[in-house]
Structures are given as C-alpha cells and as structure tokens.
C-alpha cells in the first residue's frame, strides 16, 4: 500500500491493515478515529475466470438486491465513484474459513446459508459461497461481500460452496 490514508467523499481514513484481495478489489480495515470500517478499493487486474463490467456499480446494485432479499450483510456507508471506493460496516471477528481451519465449525452456519439460499435461488441468484466471505457474530452469519450472480447449479451452495467448506474443515483435520 503506497499510502496509509485513503479518502471517501472527502473523509480521511487511516489504513490499519489489508483484510484481503478478491477478484474485484482490495479490502482494508480502516478507521476515522472513532470507528472501524472496511474500505474496498476496486482494482482492474485481469481475472481469467470472471468478467466484470463497471465493478463499482455492479457492487452497489448487488448490495441493493441482496438487502432487498434480506441477506445479512454489513451496512453500506458510502461509495466514491471517482476513486472507485466503497466504505462499509466492519463485522469484527474471524471468517468462517479461519474458524474451519482452526477446527471450530458451527453446524448452524450451514443452516443459515441454506436459509439464505431459500431467498436467493427463487430470485435466480447465487452469492460467492467461499468461506472467507462469511463472518459469524452474535448468532448471525453475515455475508460480507456484496457480490451476487445469476444462478447456475454448479456454483450453488450445495454443489460448490458446501464442498469447499467441507474441504477447508478437512484441511484442519489433516494438519492436526
């Protein structure tokens, strides 16, 4: 990161750390001195397996769609079109991926994702079911990405997401 201060709509945020990189951007944990947030900086790096148009508008549109469906997600704070940045609520805690690798699965997580699917599939949608995109907090599993895509059975939770979750839990068993 060439700088440790990023702005969204003229407000400065200090970068605390990189949270992760996805196909659409880099997510940073930032603070304004009062609270912590996630700031996503859209990137334009090539992705062999996915084609995205206007990534910022796509994320904002997907956020509205998923919110309307009642998917538990972090609140959208602000978006800055010129700098292609999104500021959203920070859901503290480890991701499902981290917890699976630590040998701390919760069977309620699968049921919560399946409940999300009962809303998503009839709307013709999938989300990115990769376990790094979910954070449990106070009994609720949050989908911390804003991405959704057209439903395709090979990429739904039962055919893609659940096997990935199971494989990550198995990695823990093999490493132990």
Per-region residue spans from a language model:
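Conserved hydrophobic core/spine positions of the Hanks-type protein kinase catalytic domain
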Residues: 115-119
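Conserved structural core of kinase catalytic domains
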Residues: 71-110
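The N-lobe alphaC helix and its flanking beta3-alphaC-beta4 segment of protein kinase-like domains
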Residues: 51-69
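Hydrophobic residue at the +6 position relative to the catalytic HRD Asp in the kinase catalytic loop
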Residues: 129-134
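Juxta-kinase regulatory segment immediately upstream of eukaryotic protein kinase catalytic domains
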Residues: 1-16
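C-lobe/activation-segment region of protein kinase-like
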Residues: 121-126, 137-176
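ATP-binding glycine-rich loop module of kinase domains
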Residues: 15-57
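Protein kinase-like catalytic core scaffold
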Residues: 37, 72, 86, 142-144
